Amino acid sequence: MNLIAQLEAEQVEALAKDIPDFKAGDTVRVGFRVTEGTRTRVQNYEGVCIARKNGHGIAGSFTVRKISFGEGVERVFPLHSTNIDSITVIRRGRVRRAKLYYLRSRRGKSARIAEDTRYKPRKSASA
């Protein structure tokens, strides 16, 4: 393992975040800490994960898309952000693409994603 990958692995270990196994097509709920003045609260953002970047590394991020009041809204979350309180997988989607950017131009029934009923958790790297 090269030096940079080793440093990234150490940083990910130091964060010790419990990140569930999810991919593009899954419906996720992200609990994001929002600071308003002196108060901090957790705001849930629920939508379809349309992309993952840089895998599970320290620079990893994912994009979540939802329809809010008839308007499509996308938000990019850093995977190891300290502002992320929780990530919960609501529903597993069955898709054949890694990036679902085509959903941006679709509305209604054509934007639906079939549920993956045959999901198997992948084996951890340590096993």
Swiss-Prot record:
Q: Name one GO cellular component term.
A: cytosolic large ribosomal subunit
Q: Tell me which NCBIfam families the record gives.
A: rplS_bact
Keyword Membrane found: no
Q: Which GO terms describe its biological process?
A: translation
Protein's UniProt keywords contain Ribonucleoprotein: yes
Q: TM segments?
A: none
Q: Which domain of life is it from?
A: Bacteria
Q: Which family does it belong to?
A: Belongs to the bacterial ribosomal protein bL19 family.
Q: What does this protein do?
A: This protein is located at the 30S-50S ribosomal subunit interface and may play a role in the structure and function of the aminoacyl-tRNA binding site.
Protein name per UniProt? Large ribosomal subunit protein bL19
Keyword vocabulary terms for this entry: Ribonucleoprotein, Ribosomal protein
The entry lists its GO molecular-function terms as: structural constituent of ribosome
